[in-house]
């Protein structure tokens, strides 16, 4: 693994330099202090070229703007607290039987993992729907506690027929991404978060000034579930309110999350569908940031490279890197075969999580 890390770091430098101007090398530039020098140069060049021209950038959330996964950590955290249990789970989310034995009662985290083994298209929505029945105000308190939690979260799961004890890391904001997001916004480049996690959970972090991202709540696109006003019985969802001009983040805190999904659903091709629906049908992002092959890459391969746009990749594993290389090759070939300008393999800035934390 050490040799792999070194090779990726070297490749990160090489790919960043391709898009970077010639400047003296130091760790970061200006406000991008928590970035490798070549990456900072490439990003600053792109920002300077695209500043104050009504451009926008898109970011995945988990393992992209913070380290680790906010849903995968909140599930065992809330289960351990007794906030989310089998008893509170919406009946519609009982998709398969729990795998209990005389000596082991399966956790919801384990249940989620077994759904993922069937298909990511099952467990992605399930993880966002699992908050059903919680009031937003209460969930916000739990998420704030989780973000401040100093240790790891104990849980367990089935690996085949063996029970494995696991310690889950809470989400940890990347300082580098906080710098980048704020720098983009300071230069008139709109930032959108497009996440496969629950939209309200992501909004609770990126739109709360204390976490430093300073993303407008209206600019968060995630897996949205219907919310209910328990007094009137009315159903709503933040995205509908935003479209209708009635969105009020504070007033929404008293709404209760449901399990029924709103669409587009922001995973895989749905991420790009959300951009087309809520951001712009024709304009392309000048930066797309992500870490998951096949899901985030629908955004990556639509970056406006003609404007010097950047494909930003946070490389968390060897397997993801290998998968990304295959996708870059396939998309470049697809562009070539269709007589389009080949951009899929251009302007990649690659960093490791440790580079920007």
What are these regions (language model features)?
Residues 2-3, 216:
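Short, solvent-exposed coil/turn linker segments
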Residues 3-11, 17-61, 69-97:
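Non-catalytic pre-domain segments flanking phosphatase-related domains
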Residues 9, 67-69, 202, 231:
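Active-site-proximal flexible loops/turns
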Residues 20-38, 48-49, 54, 141-192, ...:
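C-terminal cap/substrate-recognition subdomain and adjoining C-terminal extension
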Residues 60, 68, 133-135, 145, ...:
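Short, solvent-exposed linear motifs at loop/edge-of-secondary-structure regions
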Residues 69, 121-122, 200, 269:
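A generic alpha-helix surface/boundary motif
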Residues 70-79, 84-168:
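A metal-dependent, Asp-based hydrolase signature
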């Amino acid at each position: 693994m050490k040799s792999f890390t070194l090779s990726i770091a070297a490749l990160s430098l090489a790919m960043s330099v391709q898009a970077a101007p010639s400047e003296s090398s130091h760790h970061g530039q200006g406000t991008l202090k928590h970035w490798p020098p070549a990456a900072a140069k490439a990003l600053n060049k792109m920002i300077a070229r695209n500043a104050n021209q009504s451009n926008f950038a898109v970011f995945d959330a988990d393992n992209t703007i913070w380290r680790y996964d906010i849903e995968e950590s909140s599930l065992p955290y809330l289960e351990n607290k007794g906030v989310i249990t089998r008893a509170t789970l919406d009946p519609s989310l009982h998709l398969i039987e729990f795998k209990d034995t005389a000596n082991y009662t399966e956790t919801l985290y384990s249940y989620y993992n077994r759904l993922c083994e069937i298909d990511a298209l099952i467990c992605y929505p399930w993880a966002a729907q699992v908050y059903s029945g919680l009031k937003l105000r209460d969930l916000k308190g739990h998420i704030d506690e989780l973000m401040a939690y100093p240790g790891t979260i104990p849980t367990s799961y089935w690996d085949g027929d063996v029970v494995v004890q696991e310690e889950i890391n809470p989400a940890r904001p990347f300082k580098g991404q906080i710098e980048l997001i704020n720098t983009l916004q300071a230069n008139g480049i709109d930032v959108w978060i497009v996440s496969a996690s629950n939209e309200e959970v992501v909004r609770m972090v990126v739109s709360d000034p204390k976490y430093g991202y300073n993303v407008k709540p209206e600019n968060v696109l995630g897996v949205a579930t219907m919310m209910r006003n328990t007094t009137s019985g009315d159903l709503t969802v933040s995205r509908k309110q935003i479209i209708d001009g009635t969105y009020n983040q504070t007033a929404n805190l008293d709404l209760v999350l449901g399990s029924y999904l709103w669409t587009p659903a922001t995973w895989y091709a749905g991420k790009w569908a959300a951009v087309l629906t809520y951001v712009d049908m024709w304009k392309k992002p000048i930066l797309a940031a992500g870490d998951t092959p096949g899901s985030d890459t629908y955004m990556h391969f639509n970056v406006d490279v003609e404007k010097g746009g950047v494909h930003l990749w946070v490389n968390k594993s060897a397997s993801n890197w290998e998968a990304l290389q295959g996708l870059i090759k396939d998309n470049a070939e697809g562009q070539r075969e269709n007589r389009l300008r080949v951009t899929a393999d251009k302007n990649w800035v690659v960093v490791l999580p440790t580079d920007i934390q």
